[in-house]
Amino acid sequence: MTQARVKFTTFEEYLSYSDETPMEGRYELINGALVELPPESRLNSTIAVRILLVFVAVGIPVELVHPGKCEVQVPILQPNDAANRFPDLVILREEHLELTQRRLTITLGMPPPRLIAEVVSPGKTNRDKDYIYKRAQYAAIGVPEYWLIDPVAQTVMVLSLEGEAYREVGVFGQQAAIDSVEFAELELKVEQIF
């Protein structure tokens, strides 16, 4: 049996459809169509959980730290941009607890998450997606801090939002402690991530 492919004209249509229709996996909405994302790699998942544990250890409530499951609506800035992302790690604000009781989706009408981290997968397409496209989309919704975690280079790039664009706080290598503007209390060395 062939199913008709559904096209959406708004993000709200997609949300309504996905609330009412059982869907397995994660999907990005690109040009009105659902595009299934591949499962996360074990490495990406492991890195996200390691970071979660460190944030919880410094007192961030566990219900605010979400590895890989939080959907974030983003503006479409370039042709073929996704209208939503599933970052490898999202740190929510307290007010999100009330706003996401029914569905773990941060929409454009909500305050942005405090931090988003992406584990960069190999390949130019993946690097461009994380370093260029997602960076611009997360800045556009006002995410104060964006981390790019690169397992190949064994580095963490920390970006802090200044105005409408990100400023590079630093690229931290193996022995370095990560400098977070949003979470000054954080004590995390890059080697703890990899």
Regions from the PLM with identified roles:
Residues 1-194:
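Gly/Pro/Ser/Thr-rich low-complexity, intrinsically disordered segments predominantly at protein N-termini
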